Amino acid sequence: LLNNFFSDFFSQLPVDQSRLHIVKKRLLYLDPVGSDIYYFLDEKFDSFPVSQDKNVSKLLTVQEGCDKFCTFCVVPYTRGSEYSRPVESIYAEARNLVNNGAQELTLLGQNVSAYNSSVYKNLTENGVSLAGLCKILSSLEKLKRIRYLTSHPRDISDELINEHSSNEKLMPFLHLPIQSGSDSILKKMNRKHTKEDYIELISKIKNRVP
């Protein structure tokens, strides 16, 4: 009787779907078998209205959350851990946007450069990275340009830089916050990189994508 009471009680509580991946992690900690709640994340992303307008440039959410915990930022506490939308879902929405006239897509995420499709399914094997996602989306014939934001310096991979070099649809534009030129400030901000790390990264990008 008591179990039924609590089941009925909790079933009436409002659900913050953006936090359910955290619930999943806690359930797995308590019980390795856990309960599969991934369908909630499907509903979260699928709740976006299908765009019918004819704008040339459109925004497309591919990732949410952040695991960096910079001291000045509330995103990890309000958006939760990083998780990525399935490639199939992104491609379907992108195709719809392009068919409705979009020629440019901007991929959005609190830390979009950390996109990895395996995060969504909590898999151990490698999934599709942001570079791979850009390559897949570039197969849409009518799509002319791809952009993305916002990035973190620690997640700009060689694979992504190479994709910029080889993919003509991926624009030579990088939104990469520097935050500070002082190592002591960067350390206090918990950015986990130095001024030199940032400069070396920019030099590497410029060398590969002049």
Feature map (PLM): residue ranges:
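Proteins enriched for Cys/Gly/acidic motifs involved in redox and nucleic-acid/cofactor modification
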Residues: 1-115, 129, 159, 170, ...
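Conserved SAM/AdoMet-binding glycine-rich loop
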Residues: 99-210
